[in-house]
Amino acid sequence: MLEITSHRNGEILNYKHGRETADALMIEVRGIADPQSRVTVNGLPALRCDREFRAEVPLKSRINTVTASAKDKFGERTQSIVLVWDKGSFKRYAVRIDDNCFFLTDLARQKPARLFDHFYLKGLKSLHEKYGSKFILKCFFRNDHDEAKFTLDQVPSTYRNEFEDNADWLHLAFHALAEFPDRPYQHCTEERLAHDYDMTMNELIRIAGKKACTPPTNVHWAMLPPERFHVLRERGVKILTSSGFMSNRIYVDGKVEDLKGGSCDIGFFYEQDVAHHMLAKRCFYDPDHDLFLSRSFFCFNIDTPAEIESKIRQEDAAAAATGCEMMEAVGHEQYAFPHYENYLPDYFERLETSCRVPAELGYKPVFFQDGIFGNPAWGK
């Protein structure tokens, strides 16, 4: 018998979980083993009390392996787990807006004199100027709401300099080929995902320049088989975010209902043990695929301003126990546009609440793709 019980494989730790110095994060690793066995942790003897053991372990790298070993007359058993040191962690938030294609359609057809003459981008810039917020806009290649089926190759490169001049707070990224069908990559081939990604990103880079383009932090509907993750990793993706994992939000008779019965299928096919960890702590590292996971907990085109503020403050209060110092605001572009059938007149009020409340609580705006959820302590 041997089991590390204090930490789980893939857990992300910071100064709240131990004693941090410039060189290491000192943590206490605890577990259980047969009383007669001799236990070591990373080669050093552990303190014993009946079945329990404990040992102080320094985490010195971004990714660390902790190995417990129990040896007795029947042989030796070992357990190794991977732990991440979120060095120099700080409170931070990101804003991700999915399903972007309407504003790009307008740029191509309305041809505003300046990029931020467009109301949508003007609204984002106003929030950046007010709160310092940073936005990643996940884009479709095709606009399925347009009768002529607009595609990105119709957008001129006229605004490239403006995009690049504002790349410190505004990024464009791949989301999917188009909005429909739903769950486009749930059972896709490698070739399909690679084709859609490369075609979309090539156009975005042409439109906005490399400086203003970034690898995405998820794909449309947050559904992708793990055997396809490498397609994204090979293109620089480091993080997968989703509001699912352990929470199914559905519409029934015009109302939102939360189903907590099991792991959510909108969560990249991760199993329940990961889903339960994400529900409690919101972040995780998958050592099998070298990917970080983040669970978002509200959507500003579903939740009202009051609900958004309440959820953010609740999650911030919970961080005292979980140690999680990052959060993500998530929404969708189309609800900002009056011609969309589900237009929300208070769209920018909801989005402003998503930026204002974290700022009031001391969270700094970041891009999750930079470092560990926006923490560049180990480099980008």
Report the location of each language-model feature:
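Active-site-adjacent pocket scaffolds in enzyme catalytic domains
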Residues: 147-151, 211-212, 221-325
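Long, low-complexity serine/threonine/glycine- and acidic-rich segments characteristic of extracellular
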Residues: 2, 6-10, 26-85
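Active-site beta->alpha N-cap acidic-glycine motif
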Residues: 81-162, 213
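C-terminal domain-boundary segment and adjacent tail
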Residues: 239-244, 323-380
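Metal-dependent polysaccharide deacetylase catalytic core of the NodB/CE4 family, i.e.
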Residues: 132-227, 248-252, 324-337
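An acidic- and aromatic-residue-enriched active-site/binding cleft used to recognize and process polar
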Residues: 98-100, 140-142, 177, 219-222, ...
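Short, solvent-exposed loop/linker segments at the N-terminal edge
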Residues: 12-24
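Well-ordered, non-membrane alpha-helical segments in soluble/globular domains
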Residues: 111-124, 149-160, 190-202, 305-316, ...
